[in-house]
UniProtKB/Swiss-Prot annotation:
Keywords: Cytoplasm, Heme biosynthesis, Metal-binding, Oxidoreductase, Porphyrin biosynthesis. It is found in: Cytoplasm. The active site is at residue 114. Involved in the heme biosynthesis. Catalyzes the aerobic oxidative decarboxylation of propionate groups of rings A and B of coproporphyrinogen-III to yield the vinyl groups in protoporphyrinogen-IX. Coiled coil: none annotated. PROSITE patterns: COPROGEN_OXIDASE. The record marks 183 as: Important for dimerization. InterPro entries: Coprogen_oxidase_aer (IPR001260), Coprogen_oxidase_aer_sf (IPR036406), Coprogen_oxidase_CS (IPR018375). This is Oxygen-dependent coproporphyrinogen-III oxidase. Its cofactor is a divalent metal cation. It comes from Francisella tularensis subsp. mediasiatica (strain FSC147). Its EC number is 1.3.3.3. The keyword Metal-binding applies. Pfam families: Coprogen_oxidas. The gene is hemF.
Length: 308
């Protein structure tokens, strides 16, 4: 099992380099991803041990902020967020390896994107380790372009259908349900794919699906960036983007499993919260004008079948 974990780690670290290189190619000023490598000390007082590399870009003309973060950690006991739906795993040791990214563009017409790909192994050093994959990618637009959502979902469906034709409808629905702010009765965006506890096939079959899914992120996102990054926008557009970013913050801090897992397990706070947008605003009881571009967003982000 350790060999398989290392193989996935090698894939993720190479993917991290590929994604940051491609994103930098679309940046138009001197902003670059900086690498922040870290290691948790292997001491008795540390609940979580391991290492990682958080790659951050800030202040770009295209990407106002972005993070592509790799980590490999292990602990003596899975935190509550990881065992809430699988009580049989409570108290078990674990290894977790993953890559998580969030890209916050400067232009309000370019959507924010998020992706995550990970593996968990409980009882990794025993004769019967329990493994599962998780991940997916989702899109959060501020102003609607139907063709962008169709392209995003078509890319997701193509990858899923290559492996299992039941995956796309199942993981698309899961994504719509997961990225939902209960207290706002709003979806975070137009969704995409979300899956967890993936071990319904052999390890190699699941590995191949997850790596194909991860490799398709750039195919899904970069054409949208290229199409929208030069659209002129006003301060009104920017203000609405900042307001909607507030929803992103609310979701990450209240509902996101990765954030909760990281904080509960004693993870590296700077890396865990690096996905936060550089700026966000909240307005008391604000409502968009009837018939405005801003009002259309609230209809656009409701779950729907994007692929006719």
């Amino acid at each position: 099992m350790q060999e398989k974990i290392s193989k996935f780690e090698d894939f993720l670290t190479q993917l991290q380099q590929n994604i940051t290189t491609v994103l930098e190619q679309h940046e138009t000023n001197a902003a670059k991803f900086i690498s922040d490598k870290w290691q948790k000390p292997d001491t008795p007082d540390q609940k979580l041990k391991g290492y990682g590399n958080s790659m951050i870009i800030e202040g770009g003309e295209i990407f106002e902020k972005g993070v592509v973060a790799f980590s490999r950690v292990h602990g003596s006991e899975l935190p509550p967020s990881a065992t809430a739906k699988r009580q049989e795993l409570a108290g078990k040791s674990f290894i977790a390896t993953g890559l998580s990214l969030v890209i916050h563009p400067r232009n309000p017409f370019v959507p924010t994107s998020h992706a995550n790909f990970r593996i968990f192994i409980a009882d990794a050093d025993t004769d019967n380790p329990i493994w599962w994959f998780g991940g997916g990618f989702d899109l959060t637009p501020y102003y609607p372009f139907e063709e962008d959502a169709i392209h995003w979902h078509q890319t997701a469906k193509n990858i899923c259908d290559k492996h299992d034709k039941t995956y796309y409808p199942k993981f698309k629905k899961w994504c719509d349900e997961y990225f939902y702010l209960k207290h706002r009765d709003e979806c975070r965006g137009v969704g995409g794919l979300f899956f967890d506890d993936l071990n319904d096939k052999s390890f190699d079959e699941c590995f191949n699906f997850v790596t194909d899914c991860a490799n398709s992120y750039l195919d899904a996102y970069i054409p949208i960036v290229a199409q929208r990054k030069n659209i002129e926008y006003s301060q009104k557009h920017k203000d609405f983007q900042l307001y909607r970013r507030g929803r992103y913050v609310e979701f990450n801090l209240v509902f996101d499993r990765g954030t909760i897992f990281g904080l509960q397990s004693g993870g590296r706070t700077e890396s865990i919260l690096s996905s936060m947008p550089p700026m966000a605003t909240w307005k008391y009881n604000w409502q968009p004008e009837l018939g405005s571009e801003e009002e259309k967003v609230y209809q656009y982000i409701k779950p729907r079948d994007w692929i006719k």
